[in-house]
């Protein structure tokens, strides 16, 4: 039994009295969920012990989704240190869709691609290039994003947009200016929105995570307008 480590008490009979009438209100927040973050060693060891693999399977995620739904949630960022949710087992994404769970991704996993997918696929897909850079490898990165969107387009999702560096790092070198960073992020998001319109639909829900240094790019300064003043993301979710 996996229900927050609480084993239900067994009873021979259960009586529901007619006087008991509880109607739960509809949640006021549209997207409600959690991120399985920094999953090693706790989540990973549990997955290995109970399901035989550090790479979570649909059999494992069924319990996670059930827990999420019992908590009145509907949205998840899957584990991504040692696993790639859709690439390892696409059945994970299909199961989430079947159970009514909306799948997103963290601040550095845009366009339905898990954090480790590029490191894995660039070894076998030369069309993606080898550098995680929208300055030197924009064409390859765009193909990588496009294929992720096409793979997951029929599953309900909240698509993360934006871009950070590999392994949860800064995207640009340390000597890059605020304007440099804002401009490359704008270029990446513009391309992502074009791909989303082509592969899914333009009005599909999208999220930009304002995390760490991205907050500086969002705010800008007195000399450099930030992303908060950019009309292209005006209708998107800012987190």
Language-model segments: which ranges?
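Gly/Pro-rich turn-and-neighbor structural signature
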Residues: 6-18, 23, 81, 87-93, ...
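Feature activates predominantly on carbohydrate-active enzymes
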Residues: 1-138
């Amino acid at each position: 039994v996996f229900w927050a480590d609480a084993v239900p008490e067994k009873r021979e009979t259960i009586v529901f009295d007619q006087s008991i009438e509880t109607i739960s209100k509809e949640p006021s927040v549209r997207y409600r969920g959690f991120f399985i973050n920094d999953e090693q060693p706790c989540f990973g060891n549990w997955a290995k012990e109970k399901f035989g693999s550090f790479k979570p399977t649909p059999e494992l995620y069924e319990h996670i989704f059930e827990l999420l739904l019992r908590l009145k949630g509907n949205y998840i960022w899957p584990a991504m240190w040692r696993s790639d949710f859709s690439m390892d087992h696409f059945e994970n994404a299909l199961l989430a869709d079947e159970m009514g769970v909306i799948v997103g991704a963290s601040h550095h996993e845009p366009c339905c691609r898990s954090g480790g997918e590029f490191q894995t696929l660039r070894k076998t897909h030369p069309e993606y290039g080898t550098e995680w850079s929208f300055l030197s490898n924009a064409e390859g990165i765009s193909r990588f994003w496009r294929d992720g969107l096409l793979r997951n387009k029929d599953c309900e999702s909240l698509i993360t947009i934006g871009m950070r560096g590999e392994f949860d790092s800064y995207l640009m070198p340390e000597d890059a200016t605020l304007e440099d960073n804002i401009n490359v992020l704008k270029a990446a998001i513009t391309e992502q929105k074009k791909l989303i319109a082509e592969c899914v639909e333009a009005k599909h829900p999208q999220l930009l995570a304002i995390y760490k240094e991205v907050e500086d790019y969002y705010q800008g300064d007195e000399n450099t307008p930030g992303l908060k003043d950019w009309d292209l993301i005006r209708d998107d979710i800012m987190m």
